[in-house]
Structures are given as C-alpha cells and as structure tokens.
C-alpha cells in the first residue's frame, strides 16, 4: 500500500524499518537523538530535534540510546568509530550534518573504509552507510551548500547514492544499509519537503540502476538529484515545439548506469548532462567522457554539460538562483543541439 510521504519522512521510515529488521543497524550523529532538552537525554524526550533537519526525530524514543547515539561535535571521531563498528559486525549509519564537513572525516573514507575489503582479500567488509545533506538553493552560503558526491564517487571501494524522489529516498537508503560495502548517501536538503507516493512496506531499489523518468527520441537529458525537476520542466517546454526529450535520473553516481545512458544516446543522438556540482572533475564530465568514447558515432552534436560555476556557492538569494543550473540555461544548450528548435531560449 502506498501513500503520500515527503522526502524526509521517507528517509525516517527507511531508518526505522532497517532498525526493526536488523538489530545491528546503529545510528550516530550530532544531535540526532537530542538537540533539544539535552539535560534529559536519557528520557529521549519526544520533542528532541532528531538532527539539524529533524530527519531522525522519534527514532531515539523508539529504539533507545544504545542504537541512536548522540556524538560529540567531531566528525573525525564518530566516523572513525563507525568504521570500527562496521569492521566488527555492526551496520552503522552515521549522519554527517553537511557534506561540506566531509574533510574532517576524509581519512575514515579514503584511508580506511574504501580500502579494507581490498587489503584483506575480500574477507573484510565495511557495511557503513554515511548519510549527509548537500545542495544549493536554501541560501545556506558557501560552507553549507556544496555538492561533493563527485569527489567521493571518485574513490574506489565506495558507492554513492543521490536520490531525487521520496520513493527513491526510501528504497535506495534501505538498499544502502543492506549493502556490504560503504555507501555515502546524499540527501538534498531542498527536497526534504517534497512529497511523493511511497509504499508502507520495506523495499529496496538496486544501487547502480538509473531511472528513465520520461521516454523520448530527440534528446537525452541525464540528471543528478534535484536537477531531475529542471530536466522535466525543459522536457515539457520542448514537447510543445515537437521535440521529444528522454529524461534519465541517475540515482547513483558511483557506480553510474552506463548501459542505460548509452542506450538512450544511441536512440536520441544528443546528450545534455545537468549536474549542480562545480564544472571540473565532476560526474557530468565523467559521463561525457564515457559517452564520447563509447557512443561517439551515434552523436549528432557535441555533448553538453550544464553545471554550477567554478566558484563557491553565493549566499545572496538572487546570486544563488543564477548560480544553479536552470531551465533557461538548459533550453539555450538544447536550442544549439536541435536545429529546428522553436523555443525562445
């Protein structure tokens, strides 16, 4: 049975169901059980915040302090502890408040979690799922608005998931927690209130499999995270001019679904990739490189990548709106790819 649930609620429900299914699932993070009424934390007050955005609200009272653990303000500390937990049989789900703080925890990911399985000949696993939020659009300024999934996705041994819908948020998180590899799960904070149909039951979505959200024949647009909604707006606009757009939500950036993207490009012969990360050494350029090498003969025009500028995220609302990829920018690129396009870009 499905019902409307917002993105945040879908994540909360996934965590709850994962903890019910497996007693080895442990949550760690800053203020994820407390935050408010810290002096009576042992009572797990129902009014506790549940993290900076309230995503884990209610899980402390239900599952207890030994499984929903408030940590000191030390990403290095609790991420290191999580690697140790995972190496010894638990399935920790640490919450890194903002992905901009990942530098404090980088050794745990780059030096430890990503390499242990390889270094022990496949006999050791680190089933850790790191939850973190990302994304511009909330006027949260340069230190709380980055999208660094491409940086983490470049590390061998780590899977990276970036859901765009409430349905995917739940299914991909449950799949991540079940996975015996380390997964970094990126949540766009501007999507937390977005509602969608979400099944009540436990379900998983395959990691590494993209979703063809809209089928088309003239142009492929590949998206990451909330850029899906920019692409859908563009597709609706172009449809009025007789242009058929296929929209692919990547869902996972490490590994990303080469097969689905390549098959689409072979059909439409044109590709635009929208990625809100900065423009160099990112997922969009990786996709462009692979498609250029493996499907060059199918292309009727140059691959276009539309990203944020090569600067930190501005604080001002007006500047931030210009900073992010938007429908107008995509339509401009599409107009150059399709000769008979009759859209005023």
Functional labels for PLM-detected ranges:
Residues 1-182, 189-190, 194-345:
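Thiamine diphosphate
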Residues 185:
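Non-catalytic, usually N-terminal nucleic-acid engagement modules in DNA/RNA processing proteins
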């Amino acid at each position: 049975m499905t019902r409307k649930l917002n993105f945040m609620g879908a994540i909360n429900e996934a965590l709850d169901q994962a903890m019910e299914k497996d007693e080895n699932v442990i949550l760690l993070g800053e203020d994820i059980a407390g935050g408010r009424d810290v002096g009576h934390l042992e009572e797990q007050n129902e009014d506790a915040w549940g993290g900076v955005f309230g995503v884990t609200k209610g899980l402390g009272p239900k599952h207890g302090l030994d499984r929903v653990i408030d940590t000191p303000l030390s990403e290095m500390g609790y991420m290191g502890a999580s690697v140790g937990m995972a190496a010894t049989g638990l399935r920790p789900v640490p919450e890194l408040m903002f992905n901009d703080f990942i530098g404090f925890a980088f050794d745990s990911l780059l030096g430890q979690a990503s390499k242990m399985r390889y270094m022990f000949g496949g006999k050791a696993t680190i089933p850790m799922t790191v939850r973190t939020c990302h994304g511009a659009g909330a006027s949260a300024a340069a230190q709380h608005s980055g999208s660094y999934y491409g940086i983490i996705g470049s590390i061998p041994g780590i899977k990276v998931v970036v859901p765009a819908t409430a349905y995917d948020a739940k299914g991909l998180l449950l799949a991540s927690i079940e996975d015996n590899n380390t997964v970094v799960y990126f949540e766009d904070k501007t999507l937390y209130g977005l509602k969608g149909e979400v099944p009540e039951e436990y379900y998983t979505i395959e990691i590494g499999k993209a979703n063809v959200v809209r089928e088309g024949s003239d142009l492929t647009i590949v998206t990451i995270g909330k850029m899906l909604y920019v692409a859908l707006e563009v597709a609706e606009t172009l449809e009025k001019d007789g242009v058929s757009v296929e929209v692919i939500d990547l869902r996972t950036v490490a590994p990303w679904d080469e097969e689905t993207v390549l098959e689409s490009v072979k059909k439409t012969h044109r590709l635009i990739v929208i990625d809100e990360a900065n423009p160099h050494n990112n997922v969009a350029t990786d996709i462009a490189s692979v498609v250029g090498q493996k499907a060059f003969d199918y292309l009727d025009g140059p691959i276009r990548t539309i990203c944020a500028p090569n600067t930190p995220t501005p604080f001002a609302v007006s500047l931030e709106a210009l900073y992010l990829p938007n429908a107008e920018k995509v339509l401009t690129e599409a107009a150059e790819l399709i000769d008979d396009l009759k859209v005023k870009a």
